[in-house]
């Protein structure tokens, strides 16, 4: 799933989802920086219990930080990470738990994608190095000095993979960081910290989800636990939905489209508005003010994405016209998660039919709502897709393929022609601009009353006729009384400044060249499109070109196998999101996906999985690394990747085909690498594994999560008693011994504790980094944490949950867009009412609202932000803060008129209505209400009104107060009619909306089956 594209689609379609983070900054007093006191209330009026960090979303940015120079050592990366975590902690301020999860060994299904990424990364790095060397030679010929290359420990980002030396040292550095904060930061004193490092199998975000799922519905669990998850992957949103935890937020950096980020319109720089612009030129990397520290970079802002608001949007957006039975929102949420897998995920190749940028999710949602009545039930039941219904759904989507491919081909042709015209125009302009010119001095001009004058910078040395004489010119400008030593220092400083400028110019040119080369439209030898989607015969040509089939019989055989494996993948992914890994060995064995219309006869498939075991870290490195990254492996393992006589040398091609597959940029292409043969790989490893040192064996082993708490924590007594009990046990006996956690001592956390292999409470904790202090009076203890015993994940909110007050109503929904393949950009006529759009929305003048336009409250909010940014965020001429409360609306909001059901399933504003409904004065639109003295949320009941064409909704639309017969749904997709039997609990439970709504439901037993070897077997 595209990282920015899905998040951007969601934030634009549902704007109330996101809220900007209010960030409190450290203050500096007499040169001493005073950190933020995180024990104080959160300025965002949101108090969170647990903060979860998907650490790979922190490690990768710290290899290439935007707020400081690029690091060259591991220690610089670690320091950047510490600052990064500190900043996130200040934003969220968890009160019970901080969970840091680093990616461990991934399931085999993910390793194919990891292999492709790492091979591409190595190839791109090689190409960039060659291009940089060419540019350096060009600069030297022109006499332009460059600083020498600096040796770097972090030259290869592929080392961010389990089993490498970097990941081993990182674990130690994070343990030190946790000890440092628990010992000295008052905001950390009462929290538990769990560190799941790279030696614990599983992707970071899925280790977090396993923790959340297995805490639910156990004794002592608080159903109103408030979760916040940080990470950069778009699938975190789906994972948050899949927990069915209501009080859940995703924290991430703001995603900008090019040109979208707010800049000062005077100087064009980010980080401030015109009202407080100082007219300073943009700083280059490495430059700083005389008294500055050189770290004056713009920090990216952050946003919360609230899952409970997304649930409210989905309840309204996914309403079914004239439903055949009462709709269960929890089942709708699960179906939404499932249908979004078709637009992309990390485990299956991209289906050629659907593109997010072409409105694919809108199409999937429209088809789902239109076809729902004919499904006779939901597409999924927990982690189990009903394949018969899935086939019916995806066939309806596939019926649009011809139109989609035809429009895509037409737009691709237009885009290619436009790029060629632009390219020709730029070439002409370059020829006109070849004559050398000298830029005149800029004249100081007053911007506005009370502002500073814009300084007129002197021309750079290379704005003169001969850049190489610049240093001598600067010597001649020295005053007669200046000393020779001062002149030498001045020249040296000038040379260093020139080198920095040249280095920045080289980096800029390098980025431009790499981007130009990655653009297929800039290539003189454009790859021929042999498939020609949209032209008759596209299906046959697709299988001939992508799967190398020749005869019709072979094509049909391959098509059936591709469909089977792809359907297995859909079932595997759904289980992974809802319950966890159902097979460590399964993977999709093709580079390409089938068409939507190819997914037939799904109900006849008998799909099974065997759990198996994860790879060892070094085995995964052999499976995903190119030979260029072999330096990160032990010596004998390297030879398996580089020796021409290696039995698996064919796994490591130095050159490989990248199929552009109709895409524009090379990074969008498909790397056609050979798939790893697990049997051959393990046989080769068995010949070298005995050569590992003790340290290498440790890096190659499977370990457990570590729990850290202060000695003052209520759980500390249990940890000390555990350590005393196990002192006389052998290492093997210590690993096997465990004691159950008492939830009342751990803020409701369940699980088991095991003594760690080292000291539980070392009196001194040495710093693994130069320049950082040792902890001489350590007051932190450590032990191993084990998850609670596996139990079924019940996919609905737990008993006793209190739903936040509603923040979204029908007026907050944007009109449903025209389907991409049907939208010709023209305004359609509708009967005799003048211009009318496709969404059932029109205004009194009969004119269509332009696509993407806003109105009503959204327009008012946008105008208010514009005024605030321009006038209220700076200081006046006397340096007096101008922040004032925002004015109220300057008009009386129009009376709200309920929308009328439109014949095509949407809603339209009735005659006389003016935009969207205005919120009631008491209505909170920022998420949680402030907590009262009792520590609970206000208990104001909410009940939505039943409307024609929309199901009645109380307490979020959860139905559980009725009972229906439910025919057992089979895993192979032959389920019978389903009349909304909500999956729930054995016995009764309560859902509370504002504290006074009761819900009841019935549960079923476990569906797990086991083979004779003890491994769970999952069957669809």
From Swiss-Prot:
Main localization category: nucleus
Could you mention a single GO BP entry for this protein? nuclear polyadenylation-dependent rRNA catabolic process
Task: State the tissue distribution.
Answer: Expressed in roots, leaves, stems and flowers.
Q: Which residues form a coiled coil?
A: 487-523
Q: Which UniProt keywords apply?
A: Coiled coil, Exonuclease, Hydrolase, Metal-binding, mRNA processing, Nuclease, Nucleus, rRNA processing, Zinc, Zinc-finger
Its annotated compartments are: Nucleus
Zinc finger extent (CCHC-type): 262-279
Superkingdom of origin organism: Eukaryota
The yes or no answer to whether the keyword Phosphoprotein is present is no
The UniProt disruption phenotype note reads: Embryonic lethality.
Species, as recorded: Arabidopsis thaliana
Q: What is its EC number?
A: 3.1.13.-
PANTHER family found in the cross-reference section: 5'-3' EXORIBONUCLEASE 2, 5'->3' EXORIBONUCLEASE
Biological role: Possesses 5'->3' exoribonuclease activity. Acts as an endogenous post-transcriptional gene silencing (PTGS) suppressor. Degrades miRNA-derived loops, excised during miRNA maturation in the nucleus. Required for proper development. Involved in pre-rRNA processing. Involved with XRN2 in the 5'-end exonucleolytic processing of 5.8S and 25S rRNAs. Contributes with XRN2 to polyadenylation-dependent nuclear RNA surveillance. Involved in the degradation of aberrant polyadenylated pre-rRNA through 5'-end processing.
> Where are stretches of biased composition, namely Basic residues?
1000-1020
Question: Which Gene Ontology cellular component terms are annotated?
Answer: nucleus
A single GO molecular-function term is: 5'-3' RNA exonuclease activity
Q: Where is this region: Disordered?
A: 113-144, 411-440, 452-483, 831-859, 875-897, 911-1020
The UniProt entry's sequence similarity note says:
Belongs to the 5'-3' exonuclease family. XRN2/RAT1 subfamily.
Name of this protein: 5'-3' exoribonuclease 3
Basic and acidic residues compositional bias: what residue ranges? 121-144, 414-433
Regions of compositional bias (Low complexity) in chain numbering: 831-844, 911-923, 960-972
Q: Sorted alphabetically, which SMART domains does this protein's record hold?
A: ZnF_C2HC
């Amino acid at each position: 799933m595209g990282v920015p594209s899905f998040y951007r689609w969601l934030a634009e379609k549902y704007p109330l989802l996101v809220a900007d983070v209010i960030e409190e900054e450290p203050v500096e007093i007499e040169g001493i920086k005073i950190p933020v006191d995180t024990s104080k209330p959160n300025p965002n009026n949101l108090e969170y219990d647990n903060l979860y960090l998907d650490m790979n979303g922190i490690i990768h940015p710290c290899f290439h930080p935007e707020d400081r120079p690029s690091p060259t050592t591991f220690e610089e990366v670690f320091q950047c990470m510490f600052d990064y975590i500190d900043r996130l902690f200040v934003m969220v301020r968890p009160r019970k738990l901080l969970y840091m999860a680093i990616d461990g060994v991934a399931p085999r299904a993910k390793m194919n994608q990891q292999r492709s990424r790492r091979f591409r990364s190595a190839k791109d790095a090689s190409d960039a190095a060659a291009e940089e060397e060419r540019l350096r030679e060009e600069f030297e010929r022109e006499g332009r000095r460059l600083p020498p290359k600096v040796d770097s420990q972090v030259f290869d980002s592929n080392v961010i993979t389990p089993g490498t030396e970097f990941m081993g040292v990182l674990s130690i550095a994070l343990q030190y960081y946790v000890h440092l904060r628990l010992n000295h930061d008052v905001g950390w004193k009462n929290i538990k910290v769990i560190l799941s490092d790279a030696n614990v199998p599983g992707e970071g975000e899925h280790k977090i989800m396993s923790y959340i799922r297995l805490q639910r519905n156990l004794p002592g669990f608080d159903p109103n636990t408030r979760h916040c998850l940080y990470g950069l992957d778009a699938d975190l949103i789906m994972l948050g939905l899949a927990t069915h935890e209501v009080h859940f937020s995703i924290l991430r950096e703001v995603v900008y489209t090019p040109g979208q980020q707010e800049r000062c319109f005077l100087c064009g720089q980010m980080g401030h508005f015109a009202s407080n612009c100082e007219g300073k030129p943009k700083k280059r990397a490495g430059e700083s003010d005389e008294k500055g520290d050189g770290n004056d970079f713009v920090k990216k802002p952050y946003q919360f994405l609230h899952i409970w608001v997304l649930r409210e949007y989905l309840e309204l957006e996914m309403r079914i016209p004239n439903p055949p039975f009462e709709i269960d929102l929890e089942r709708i949420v699960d179906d939404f998660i499932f249908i979004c897998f078709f637009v992309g995920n990390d485990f299956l190749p991209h289906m050629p039919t659907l593109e997010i940028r072409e409105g694919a999710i809108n199409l999937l949602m429209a088809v789902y709502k239109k076809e729902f009545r004919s499904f006779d039930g939901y597409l999924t039941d927990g982690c189990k897709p009903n394949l018969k219904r899935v086939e019916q759904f995806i066939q309806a989507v596939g019926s649009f393929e011809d139109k989609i491919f035809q429009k895509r081909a037409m737009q691709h042709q237009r885009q290619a022609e436009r790029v060629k015209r632009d390219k020709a125009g730029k070439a002409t302009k370059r020829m006109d601009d070849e004559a050398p010119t000298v830029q005149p001095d800029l004249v100081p001009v007053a911007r506005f009353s009370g502002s500073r004058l814009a300084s007129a910078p002197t021309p750079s040395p290379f704005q003169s006729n001969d850049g190489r004489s610049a240093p001598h010119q600067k010597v001649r400008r020295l005053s007669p009384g200046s000393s020779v030593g001062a002149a030498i220092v001045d020249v040296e400083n000038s040379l260093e400044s020139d080198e920095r400028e040249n280095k920045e110019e080289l980096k800029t040119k390098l980025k431009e060249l790499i981007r130009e080369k990655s653009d297929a439209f800039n290539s003189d030898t454009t790859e021929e499109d042999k498939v020609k989607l949209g032209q008759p015969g596209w299906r046959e040509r697709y299988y001939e070109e992508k799967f190398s089939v020749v005869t019709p019989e072979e094509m049909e055989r391959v098509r059936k196998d591709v469909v089977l494996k792809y359907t297995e993948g859909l079932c595997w992914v759904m289980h992974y999101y809802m319950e966890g890994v159902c097979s460590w060995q399964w993977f999709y064995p093709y580079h390409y996906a089938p068409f939507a219309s190819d997914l037939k006869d799904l109900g006849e498939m008998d799909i099974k999985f065997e759990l198996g075991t994860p790879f060892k870290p070094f085995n995964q490195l052999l499976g995903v690394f190119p030979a260029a990254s072999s330096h990160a492996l032990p010596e004998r393992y390297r030879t398996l990747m580089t020796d021409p006589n290696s039995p698996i040398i064919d796994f490591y091609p130095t050159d490989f085909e990248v199929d552009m597959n109709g895409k524009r940029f090379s990074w969008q292409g498909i790397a056609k690498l050979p798939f790893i043969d697990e049997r051959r790989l393990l046989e080769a490893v068995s010949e070298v594994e005995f050569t590992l040192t003790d340290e290498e064996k440790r890096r190659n082993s499977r370990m457990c999560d570590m729990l850290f708490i202060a000695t003052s924590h209520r759980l500390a007594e249990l940890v000390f008693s555990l350590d005393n009990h196990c002192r006389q046990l052998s290492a093997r006996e210590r690993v096997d011994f465990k004691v159950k956690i008492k939830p009342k001592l751990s803020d409701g956390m369940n699980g088991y504790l095991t003594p760690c292999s080292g000291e539980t409470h070392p009196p001194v904790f040495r710093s693994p980094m130069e320049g950082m202090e040792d902890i001489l009076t350590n007051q932190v203890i450590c032990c191993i944490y084990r998850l609670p015993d596996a139990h079924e994940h019940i996919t609905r909110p737990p008993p006793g949950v209190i739903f936040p007050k509603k923040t979204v109503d029908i007026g907050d929904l944007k009109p449903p867009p025209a389907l991409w393949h049907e939208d010709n950009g023209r305004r359609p006529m509708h009967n005799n009412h003048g211009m009318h759009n496709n969404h059932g929305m029109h205004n009194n003048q009969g004119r269509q609202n332009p696509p993407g336009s806003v109105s009503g409250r959204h327009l008012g909010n946008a105008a208010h932000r514009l005024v605030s940014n321009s006038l209220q965020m700076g200081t006046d001429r006397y340096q007096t803060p101008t922040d004032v409360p925002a004015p109220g609306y300057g008009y009386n909001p129009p009376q709200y008129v309920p929308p009328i059901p439109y014949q095509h399933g949407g809603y339209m504003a009735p005659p006389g209505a003016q935009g969207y409904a205005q919120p009631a004065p008491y209505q909170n639109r920022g998420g949680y209400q402030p907590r009262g003295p009792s520590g609970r949320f206000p208990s104001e009941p909410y009940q939505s009104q039943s409307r024609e064409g929309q199901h009645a909704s109380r307490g979020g639309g959860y139905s559980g107060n009725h009972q229906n017969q439910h025919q057992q749904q089979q895993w192979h997709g032959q389920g019978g009619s389903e009349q909304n039997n909500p999956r729930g609990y054995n016995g009764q439970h309560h859902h509370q909306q504002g504290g006074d709504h009761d819900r009841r439901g019935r549960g079923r037993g476990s569906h797990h089956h086991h083979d004779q070897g003890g491994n769970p077997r999952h069957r669809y």
